[in-house]
Amino acid sequence: MGVISEFKAFAVKGNVVDMAVGIIIGAAFGKIVSSFVGDVVMPPIGLLIGGVDFGDLAITLKAAQGDVPAVVLAYGKFIQSVIDFVIVAFAIFMGVKAINRLKREEAVAPSLPPTPTKEEVLLGEIRDLLKAQNDKPLP
């Protein structure tokens, strides 16, 4: 089997396609959460603590000199990233929790015993006949 045909077989498998879709949706969800945090959550929080824009919070370690930019610790952006992470982690946690609950409900549902196959029925009849023959008294 050639490399290209092996790759096709790998790429077409359901798990790989599902994983790729999950990664794409996850990246899009991350952008939505970043926008939500930066544009919806942080402005009111900044307003509550005195009109601070968290994106601008930084400590200058070395001032800019000519063409050399300043060296800064942009801890405001870090705070926003931490909040992004917490929201994404919480959303994933809630999703996994819901999936686990559905799996538990499926496991709890009683399953009917499987119906015996024709061979199993025939073997049972043979067993019963042999048992009946062995239980007869000897002449």
From Swiss-Prot:
Domain of life: Bacteria
Chief place of localization: membrane
Cellular compartment(s): Cell inner membrane
GO cellular component: plasma membrane
Keywords on record: Cell inner membrane, Cell membrane, Ion channel, Ion transport, Membrane, Transmembrane, Transmembrane helix, Transport
Pfam families assigned: MscL
Ranges that cross the membrane: 9-29, 79-99
GO molecular function annotation: mechanosensitive monoatomic ion channel activity
Alphabetical list of InterPro entries matching this protein: Mechanosensitive_channel_CS (IPR019823), MS_channel (IPR001185), MSC/AndL (IPR037673), MscL_channel (IPR036019)
Membrane topology: Multi-pass membrane protein
PROSITE patterns in the record: MSCL (PS01327)
Reported function: Channel that opens in response to stretch forces in the membrane lipid bilayer. May participate in the regulation of osmotic pressure changes within the cell.
PANTHER family, per database record: LARGE-CONDUCTANCE MECHANOSENSITIVE CHANNEL, MECHANOSENSITIVE CHANNEL MSCL
Membership in a protein family: Belongs to the MscL family.
NCBIfam families, per the entry: mscL, PRK00567.1-4
Subunit-structure text: Homopentamer.
Protein name: Large-conductance mechanosensitive channel
